[in-house]
Amino acid sequence: MTRRFAHRLRCFLPVIVMGLLVTAEGCHSPFVQTIIDNQSDATLKLVEVDYPSASFGVETLAAHSKYHYRFKIQGSGTITLQFADASGKLQTSTGPELSEGQEGSLQIIIGRDRQVSWKPVLRTTK
């Protein structure tokens, strides 16, 4: 390696590194961080969240516990929650409209009276 080449490499290396960092920053997929928060005194069973184009869930969610999940919205539509309460009765709640490209957080709170509240903090990405 010649001195001239080594000098040019030292001069241009920071420019190359900055270019790679800017490119990497542009590679971002929008995800929704979700928490299902069971604030009731009973264990819930067959907890399922349906959102546009997919679903996720957990077989049981103990009283006063939380379930964390991250998903990507593909398509648009309403999100719903379904679970069986302690007596085995199926409960359903409809949440907010979701649109492809949204990201942020969503908290789904199941209260002591089995009432469900939805707390979305979502924004649309480019």
Task: Show where each model-derived region lies.
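Bacterial signal peptide processing site
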Residues: 26-30
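A short, solvent-exposed beta-strand micro-motif common in secreted/extracellular proteins
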Residues: 76-87
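Short acidic/proline- and small/hydrophobic-mixed sequence motifs that coincide with surface turns
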Residues: 42-46, 91
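Asparagine-centered strand-capping/turn motif at beta-strand->loop junctions
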Residues: 34-41
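Intrinsically disordered, low-complexity Pro/Gly/Ser/Thr-rich segments with frequent PxxP/GP/PP motifs
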Residues: 53-75
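Sec-dependent bacterial lipoprotein signal peptides
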Residues: 1-25
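Extracellular beta-sheet/turn segments enriched in Thr/Pro/Gly and aliphatic residues
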Residues: 95-126
